């Protein structure tokens, strides 16, 4: 789709005389022949009788009156960007911000209507909330997001399913896990067979096997029997624990209420005053 050509107004001085009006008209004609923008002549006051006579004699319409040349929002060099899906993970959103060097993304629906905004600050706040181990369940995160964030592979389960219960838990040893693993928990484990088996037997909703470790067939068989999802990731336990909460979707953190909105015709100074308050 071709980009809309920019419109530029050419205006003479206030209380215009014939020279001012004709200069604006002539310069507008010249610029339209040479430039890639659309140029329009304007006047900054009422036309006097002499100028009206000259324009009528040559059959030229007088320029439209322009009473305000204050810069408007549409005059600002605004970077256009495509909207994002509200289900996008905050990890993916952050990566997009980093790669495109922007600090705000717009979440839109199928009709391209604005649903909310997510900023770098929102993502930073989410990452600093280290104690919310139930964030994936609260936000009903899809396993697709988890797989993408952890660069993982699902060995057992449905990638289209969503996490609806449980918390993120790191399984270290059966002794520490005993009584600590709750039904539905997402348990991050190493390659220790007994840790994987205990997590499954104690009702984990999913286990994430770290360091790309191979998963024994007996573990997969027990997981299938218990309805436990099995995921592998190349990341170690520390990295996986840091990353997994960033699989939560943008919609859980975005701002969707009390958003400041301005028309493209709003004066920049008026918009600045509103934003300052």
Q: Which residues make up each language-model segment?
A:
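Hydrophobic beta-strand scaffold residues
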Residues: 62, 230-231
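Short, glycine/polar-rich helix-capping loops at beta-to-alpha or helix-loop-helix junctions
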Residues: 49-51, 214-220
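Bateman/CBS regulatory modules and CBS-like beta-alpha motifs in cytosolic regions of diverse proteins
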Residues: 66-96, 108, 143-156, 163-187, ...
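Short, solvent-exposed cationic patches
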Residues: 117, 133-147
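Short, structured coil segments at secondary-structure junctions
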Residues: 58, 202-203, 224-226
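A short, polar/charged loop-to-alpha-helix boundary motif
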Residues: 120-136, 241
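Divalent-cation
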Residues: 130-139, 157-217, 231-233
